[in-house]
Swiss-Prot record:
Protein name as catalogued: Gamma-glutamyl phosphate reductase
EC number assigned by the record: 1.2.1.41
Single biological process term from Gene Ontology: L-proline biosynthetic process
Compartments where located: Cytoplasm
Transmembrane spans: none
Domain of life: Bacteria
Family, as annotated: Belongs to the gamma-glutamyl phosphate reductase family.
Organism: Lacticaseibacillus paracasei (strain ATCC 334 / BCRC 17002 / CCUG 31169 / CIP 107868 / KCTC 3260 / NRRL B-441) (Lactobacillus paracasei)
Main location: cytoplasm
Keywords: Amino-acid biosynthesis, Cytoplasm, NADP, Oxidoreductase, Proline biosynthesis
NCBIfam families: PRK00197.1 (NF001221), proA (TIGR00407)
Amino acid sequence: MDATTIDLEQMGRAAKTAAMTLGQLTTLQKNTGLLAMAAALETHADTILAANKADLAAASALPEKFVDRLALTKARIADMAAGVRQVATLDDPTAQTDRAWVNEAGLTIAQKRVPLGVVGMIYEARPNVTVDAAALTFKSGNAVILRGGKEALHSNLALATVLQDALAAKELPRDAVQLITDPSRAVATQMMHLNGYIDVLIPRGGKGLIKAVVEQATVPVIETGAGNCHIYVDAHAQLQMAVAIVVNAKVQRPSVCNAAEKLLIHADVANEQLPVIAKALQDHGVELRGDERARAIVPSMHAATAEDWDTEYNDLIMAVKVVDSEEEAIQHINAHNTKHSEAIITDNYQNSQQFLQQVDAAVVYVNASTRFTDGYEFGFGAEIGISTQKLHARGPMGLAALTTIKYQVLGNGQIRKN
């Protein structure tokens, strides 16, 4: 159900009805729907590209990195379809029993995974999120209400229509996937207050969007992360490894949330290693902003401000700080990070364990790039987002994160005696 004059409660009722049906589908039925959606994306690629062309024309004055995320090609649509097919191969969490036991009264208690119900998504101008969210929610037995960025409205509408038609052709609920076509903030705010219809709301986008949803929503929210990610080069770090990891984490895709934004380096190795790491970054076009001690070693750095330590750049910019101890590095990270992904480079086992235990983040790495924080890399398949909160789900969220627990208890007439 789509509407130009939005009746969100009507959409919510339709989603609830669809969710009841989805919760009863077999894994085979859900996979059939997913394969139909994947095929439809490929069949209707020209229609989707025409809609995307309209969005791109309106966005021509926006920054290049924004336009790149918005743009679709036949290859990107093929990748979307492949992603949907890959979701079809994943284990269905709702077909599993987590554990079962018999209690002292003879009751058989089974802990099962069940769908959340209706998932709401508020996200920026990334058409791929429309498809990823539809595939993951459908496989996990949830209905989804999507509200994408206004810059991608034509693309999202084309994609949602293709997915809905594919489901309907297989006699599956069309309202399993619904798109809000009014991009106004007023409607977004109304969506955030759709208690009784939306079971959980997941924002995906920049810090401002996520902050607005977390602060304004009255429905439960899973906070997905802005990524102010750090790499700490310990006193026992191998230089070659440090260069490779830092460059990969910063340069490969600087606009994504798992890119590194800050470099901390121990004073004992800073004079030797920082000039080499800095040159490698600068050779890739990275602007470095250092504290006073870092600039004394690499004078070409710009001066870092207090604001820099809390900024997610999403760009080829990195702030650098020299620290005197691992404890200082950990304190700095915990004071300024967004609880997303943090890494230490070290050959010292004790230091690695201290970092793993004391850094407060969804994902903590030893001798690896923060770029691995991703559903595919973790073996979850596509992800609905990367949670930086601690309740319900944390880190890359795959299918299991879109379910909750139900206890099924079987008896033969037992009554409680006390």
